[in-house]
Amino acid sequence: MAGVDLIAVTGATGGLGGRVARRLAERGMSQRLVVRDLGRAPELAGAEAAAASYDDPERLRRAFQGARTLLMVSASEDPDRLRLHANVVEAATDAGVERVVYTSFFGAAPECTFTFGRDHWHTEELIKGSGLAWTMLRDNLYLDFLPLMVGADGVIRGPAGDWRMAGVTRDDIADVAVAVLPEGGRHVGRTYDMTGPEAVTMAEAAEQLSRFAGRTISYHAETLEEAYASRAHYGAPAWEVAGWVTTYAAIANGDLEAVSGDVAALAGHPPMRLAEFLRRNPESYRQLRGSAPASPPDTAPAEGAT
C-alpha cells in the first residue's frame, strides 16, 4: 500500500474500532488493521492486517510503519493502561505517523469523578507532548452498554441520583471518526465532544428499556456507600469497582449531562436518541427478556485494542 494515505486502525476487532474499519472500507480508504490475533481480523476491501498488542512496542512500531494517520482506540481498563498508551504513542512517533485520532472520554481531567477518565486526560497530555498532530474524540457513556447495567432482578442500581447523562452510540462515534480520519487540516488540534442529542436520567433510561424489553426495568438510586457494598461480592479488584461506581457518581455530579452538537456537525446527521438505538438494536437488550445477565451489572465488553 505504498504511495497511498494509509490509516492504521487499532482495536479493529472491537466494537468501536471494527465499526470504523468497516466504514473506511465502504469509502474505499486504505487501512491497516492492528489486531492482537490475525485470525480474528476482518477481511475488508482495501485493508491489510498486522499483529501487535499495546504491550509490544516493537511490533506496534512495525505495524504503524507507512501509516500517515492512526486511530488510537483506548485500551481496556487496566491499572497499567497509561504505560500501554505510552507504548502506542512512542511507537507511532518512531514509525513516522503524522497524526493520531484518540478516543478519549467526555470531561477527561486529572481529578475527574469517573476514575477511568483520569487515564484519558493523561493520555491526551502524552499525545500533545509527543510532537504528533492530534484530534481527540471525547466519548460520553455508550448507550450500547445501558442494557448491561441492569441486574438479574431488572433493577439498575447506582449512585446517579436524578441527574442526567448525554450518552452516545458507538455507531455515531464511528461515523465521526470516519469523517475526521482522512482529513488533517481543520481537525488538527481539535477536541470534539461525542454525545447524544438528549440527556436522560437513569430512571428515564429504565422506562425506555422496559418498553422495548417487554418487562419492568427500574432504577434504584444508591448512596456511594451502598454502591460499593452491593458490588463487593463480585470479587473484582478495588480499582475496577471504583470505575463502576464512579460512572454513576459522575452522572450525579453533572459531569456527563451537557449535550454537544459535534456529532451532528461532523457526521452530517443527528446522533441517535436512546429510543432510536433500542429500536434499531434489539440484540442489545435480548438478555433482559427473561434470562439473567452473564456478567455483573456495570460491566461491559471492553473497547480495548483487541
Q: What are the roles of these predicted feature ranges?
A:
Residues 225-306:
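A hydrophobic C-terminal alpha-helical subdomain
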Residues 71:
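Short, basic/glycine-rich phosphate-binding loops at helix/coil junctions
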Residues 48-51:
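Conserved SAM-binding strand-loop segment of SAM-dependent methyltransferases
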Residues 2-44, 55-68, 76-86, 90-99, ...:
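Oxidoreductase cofactor-interface core, primarily capturing Rossmann-like NAD(P)-dependent enzymes
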